[in-house]
From Swiss-Prot:
Organism: Felis catus (Cat)
Annotated spans, Regulatory juxtamembrane domain: 539-571
Protein name as it appears in the record: Macrophage colony-stimulating factor 1 receptor
Subcellular location: Cell membrane
One Pfam family of this chain: ig
Post-translational modification: Autophosphorylated in response to CSF1 or IL34 binding. Phosphorylation at Tyr-558 is important for normal down-regulation of signaling by ubiquitination, internalization and degradation. Phosphorylation at Tyr-558 and Tyr-807 is important for interaction with SRC family members, including FYN, YES1 and SRC, and for subsequent activation of these protein kinases. Phosphorylation at Tyr-696 and Tyr-921 is important for interaction with GRB2. Phosphorylation at Tyr-720 is important for interaction with PIK3R1. Phosphorylation at Tyr-720 and Tyr-807 is important for interaction with PLCG2.
GO BP term, pick one: positive regulation of phosphatidylinositol 3-kinase/protein kinase B signal transduction
GO molecular function: ATP binding; cytokine binding; growth factor binding; macrophage colony-stimulating factor receptor activity
Gene name tied to this protein: CSF1R
Amino acid sequence: MGPRALLVLLVATAWHAQGVPVIQPSGPELVVEPGTTVTLRCVGNGSVEWDGPISPHWNLDLDPPSSILTTNNATFQNTGTYHCTEPGNPQGGNATIHLYVKDPARPWKVLAQEVTVLEGQDALLPCLLTDPALEAGVSLVRVRGRPVLRQTNYSFSPWHGFTIHKAKFIENHVYQCSARVDGRTVTSMGIWLKVQKDISGPATLTLEPAELVRIQGEAAQIVCSASNIDVNFDVSLRHGDTKLTISQQSDFHDNRYQKVLTLNLDHVSFQDAGNYSCTATNAWGNHSASMVFRVVESAYLNLTSEQSLLQEVTVGEKVDLQVKVEAYPGLESFNWTYLGPFSDYQDKLDFVTIKDTYRYTSTLSLPRLKRSEAGRYSFLARNAGGQNALTFELTLRYPPEVRVTMTLINGSDTLLCEASGYPQPSVTWVQCRSHTDRCDESAGLVLEDSHSEVLSQVPFHEVIVHSLLAIGTLEHNRTYECRAFNSVGNSSQTFWPISIGAHTQLPDELLFTPVLLTCMSIMALLLLLLLLLLYKYKQKPKYQVRWKIIESYEGNSYTFIDPTQLPYNEKWEFPRNNLQFGKTLGAGAFGKVVEATAFGLGKEDAVLKVAVKMLKSTAHADEKEALMSELKIMSHLGQHENIVNLLGACTHGGPVLVITEYCCYGDLLNFLRRQAEAMLGPSLSVGQDPEAGAGYKNIHLEKKYVRRDSDFSSQGVDTYVEMRPVSTSSSNDSFSEEDLGKEDGRPLELRDLLHFSSQVAQGMAFLASKNCIHRDVAARNVLLTSGRVAKIGDFGLARDIMNDSNYIVKGNARLPVKWMAPESIFDCVYTVQSDVWSYGILLWEIFSLGLNPYPGILVNSKFYKLVKDGYQMAQPAFAPKNIYSIMQACWALEPTRRPTFQQICSLLQKQAQEDRRVPNYTNLPSSSSSSSSSSSSCRTGSGGGSSSEPEEESSSEHLACCEQGDIAQPLLQPNNYQFC
């Protein structure tokens, strides 16, 4: 047996073992040099076939069960993938081998120079590498060496070429395959990639105008425009069956190709009238639109109505009178007019007119019709061709009215019944025994007057009829009733004949029986109770918006804008479904503030932590209106870095929600007190619950604390309502002491206090520039966010002012008296200057590290006298002299002598610059120095500053203040309430 036969036998044996054709030489790839003889043998169980780049240079030798491909001079053109299949094998299967003919002069074999795909499909650029060793240095470039677009996503296979994945229309270019050969770049011939738009529908088509009317001789224009995502589409304009030859304008706009046909007619004639159709054709199909062009001899104005011109409507109902107008040229004027007959009806008629090219529809609405609105209503229209009118006659139907009188006719007693109404009423008489206001169904019919005398029948007025009933001799204890009715309703009136001899009177003692007296007493008691409850309700404080916006002023007389009249911009509306609520940050008498996560606020993928204000479910309508007013004021003011800014709102589909910035470090007052406790120690700091975190919540707890009015410890009931998280457990706080450790752990420096003061002043200057008065400037209403940035807010909603002794009852409101200017306390005058006074109190809070203003002084008549006489608090322990001078300027009794917030900002900026130049002011005093400062402050007394009282009396008061520091007593006394 020869070697060749043995080889065939071995290959056949291997194929039977595998069940698929086998190619020799084995292996997925074969690399040869140019000019080499290449032999590919495929062996199967039956006849086999070759598939691949088989050119005439290949010789095919069939030797079943094998097939042999041979070429004596291999070139780079023979590079490619060759497949061997066995058609007769039911199991299918094929064998594959890839042939490389590595030609250094031709590293690429390009199978096609043009590739067309739909947008979004993968595009294969068939440039095959002839040498697998060059794969590391291949790349894809655009023609003339330009790089591919940055967004082009492609991959490379040496067997197949480059594949651009999900080709885009913008990637329509000529590409070249590039390889590094012996240090130089060799590119293939160009391959034009054509990316076509996926035509999923017809071209967009517009034919304007939709309807056209012209007078003979006028000019006209018809525009047919079409747009398509691909340039391969046509557009045509036809008049009837005739295709018009019109020059076409092309453009590319908004990623669409546009083609426009414009027909201009300078002098139209009747031959130009008719149907015009515009057709656009693309790969998907045709799309057509048509219009009608009418040519008329002259202008016209036609008025019609689908309603009857004679209208009858029941009084109290609504009617709409509608007129349809066809006019060319368009209407110059039109109006509805009431033509009478009731001259006292002068109300402005409410009508709506809708225009549609050459047609108008005007509708006059008459709601809840009154009798005086009956009459003629005329619609009058005018255009260049003249004028025309259409008149409706409106008659009102209403039930009868009856009046019965008695008269003598021919010496006989006669009852006269006058009935008026529309339509004409019919009259019947009945009588019943005894005196009664109305006869029942058992009453006997006396007369059915079907021929009542018509006294008056005027158009648009009621019809008045008379009916007479002769009763002869009067009978005592009998009632006569006249009944009138029409299609709308009925009415009646009774008449009692009075007999002089039959008159009787009840005894006086029967008028006030014990039962009657008891009922009257109970009614009086209930009335008193109702009045008492009403008084208590009126005295109950209501949730009000503290912020006010000035509309105008004259002297000290201010006119404020009604916030309910401010517009609400729907741009603030935010889907309530995109809010994920967390814990309650604060809860007060009227509502609460809840932590929430807002999804898509500002940007679609944004996730932002926010604070959401909402009312309690038991809120009254005026409180809901107040929250809506607060929302309108915040949106009216706009944004500023140093106010708690509005982020959005939910006003539809549920309770009103106001979305504001979330300030993670809570209010400034608690922040200062935490810092004071950390710096000075518990014995010298203000009271603070160790479990209380920084937040918004009002918690009223009875606990041990350090007295805030001085620097001495005491025990009692803490009545300051702090803003803290709902849960006092540190494990449940999202912002616990551990979370705030980094921020709180940084030592509090003088520059921090100056920054707080300056930031609040900048926020107040912004509010003043917007003519806005805050009316509750205090450290508790200032929040701190990351970076120790102070933001002004108003948290009356989430503060339990019912139990906060800082708010004193005056009238039916609770007011922060210790922070209020004299003119606000005594004259109820609130201005920007009164906010400046409150800002001075806020400065005192900041530089005393959170002490309560006017320490040791109760809010009573003596306190009011001190304020009126110009009493000022002493310089705080940590305030530089210049800062205390600003406080004193803010506390000037004459409002006009107080500085503006802009001036305060300048003064604080100057002080901050001095602080940077003087190192001694960088850090606040230590515990020892603070202690001495506190003692010094006590010796100086709370009465530092100007006072009109004698010095001796003031000194005794200061000494008494210091003596009180040694006595354990509540921080704020329970009798801090003053009624206006």
